[in-house]
Amino acid sequence: GFADEEGVRYQTAYLGSKVIAGCFEASDLKRKDADGIAMAEAIRKFGGDPMKLQSARLNPKKLLGYVEAHIEQGPVLQKKNLAAGVVTAIAGQSRFKIIFTGHAGHAGTTPMDMRQDALCAAAELVLAVEKYARKTTDLVATVGQIKAEPGASNVIPGEVNLTLDVRHQKDSVRRAACFALQKIAQKIAGARKAKISWQ
């Protein structure tokens, strides 16, 4: 991972690896975190020079190999009572920001059959993501953040923002899963008369 493997702050996984592989997108420097701090600014605060990232690619002809010692972040080795393991593949990641937009309304006076509850659409997608991932070998998919607006106990949620993280060792399987999950989300939105944004 080298730096920022998970990419939580700027939603850019494998930042350091992308830099040394020559795959870093300069446009990512404009990404902002939850506090509005641009990636370029954060790199400067840590003593780095964001303008040098594009030229930091390592020459593969000068490398014999690479070994990285890493802790296991999951429970598999412990469950199998093993002290160490050898990585045979690294899962690629896809991340999405999804917004369901329905119609906010009074919780006490809006009949159930007249609601466009964005949270119900999001909840349905969360369960669909889990179901899809469970039936696909080695696929993991996670809705890690969810925020309902306006966020009052007496108001039907009119908008829900959520994140989706999809991972698999084979890019083709991961891409197919992302495509399928987007179609599922669109179907859910249509059935619930909600709008959906998938980024």
Residue positions per predicted region:
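Acidic/histidine-rich catalytic neighborhood of metal-dependent amide-processing enzymes
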Residues: 1-84, 127-155, 162-165, 175
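Acidic-glycine-rich active-site phosphate/pyrophosphate-binding loop
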Residues: 89-102
